[in-house]
């Protein structure tokens, strides 16, 4: 890729992306379920094998068979790592320049304020070699650099391109076009340890729809996944809604897993949130 602008900037970068994906439909009686998995990397020798991707897809599909709804309740919720990155996406949207200068963000005027628990650190690593979101400059030619966005749970900075920065009377953060290798630091627990810590709860493996109010932070999304009782997976779940407010969801994060998903530009482990509403039967 080559970028050149009339203001005198000329830069280039070379990138590659390799991938293997698999989608499977499974059936049991009249019930049918679908799931998928994929591997992605900059270099082909860093990909999982086609066999491993296929086996994981099959196992994920089979565990969904026999899914049912659960009664409406309020329980701890684990967002599986590939799904947990969506929470960070909602956060980034709320601190992005466009939402801020339009005053259409539930995190308006939160700079320097506590947004997450004090163990949470969220940062950019744009110069990480081999990572999926690495870039030495943004889409306006502004140099990127590692920086903390959240430290000790406190919001340290916004996500700005040059136009939104001018509107806010601030400096660009080198984020025209988005964030680069956004990372939430992992804790010590893996997904299995999180599951074992829960007496009754819900592991979200798929989200459906986009019921997000960016102004108020109200959150409501269709979901499917696995029900947890006494620290073990009990049965698959479908046709439920996970609801809350994003401010509360961020503050009520209990743990961030060490099962980091590195297949995209957001690098995130599973996230355990206390006390979300599951709307079911």
Please state what every model-predicted region is.
Residues 43, 108-281:
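Dual-mode signal for accessory low-complexity, basic/Gly-rich regions
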Residues 1-135, 139-142, 151-154, 180, ...:
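Active-site bordering "gate/hinge" segments
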């Amino acid at each position: 890729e080559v970028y050149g602008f009339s203001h005198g900037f000329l830069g280039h970068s070379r990138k590659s992306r390799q991938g293997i994906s698999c989608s499977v439909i499974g059936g049991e009686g009249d019930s049918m379920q679908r799931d998928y998995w994929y591997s992605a990397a900059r270099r082909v020798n860093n990909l999982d094998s086609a066999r491993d991707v296929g086996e994981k897809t099959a196992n994920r599909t089979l565990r969904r068979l026999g899914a049912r709804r659960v009664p409406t309740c309020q329980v701890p919720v684990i967002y599986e790592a590939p799904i947990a990155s969506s929470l960070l996406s909602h956060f980034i949207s709320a601190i992005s320049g466009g939402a801020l200068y339009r005053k259409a963000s539930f995190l308006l005027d939160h700079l320097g304020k506590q947004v997450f628990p004090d163990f949470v650190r969220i940062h950019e690593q744009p110069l990480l070699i081999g990572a999926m979101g690495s870039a030495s400059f943004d889409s306006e030619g502004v140099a990127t650099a590692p920086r903390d966005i959240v430290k000790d749970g406190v919001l340290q900075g916004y996500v700005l391109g040059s136009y939104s920065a001018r509107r806010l009377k601030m400096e660009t953060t080198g984020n025209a076009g988005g964030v680069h290798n956004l990372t939430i630091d992992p804790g010590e627990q893996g997904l299995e340890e999180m599951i074992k810590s829960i007496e009754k709860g819900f592991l979200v493996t798929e989200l459906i729809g986009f019921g997000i109010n960016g102004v108020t932070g109200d959150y409501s999304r269709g979901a499917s996944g696995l029900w947890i009782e006494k620290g073990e997976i009990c049965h698959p779940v479908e046709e439920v809604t996970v609801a809350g407010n994003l401010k509360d969801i961020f503050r009520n994060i209990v743990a961030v897993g060490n099962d980091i998903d590195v297949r995209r530009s957001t690098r995130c482990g599973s996230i355990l949130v206390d006390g979300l509403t599951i709307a079911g039967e």
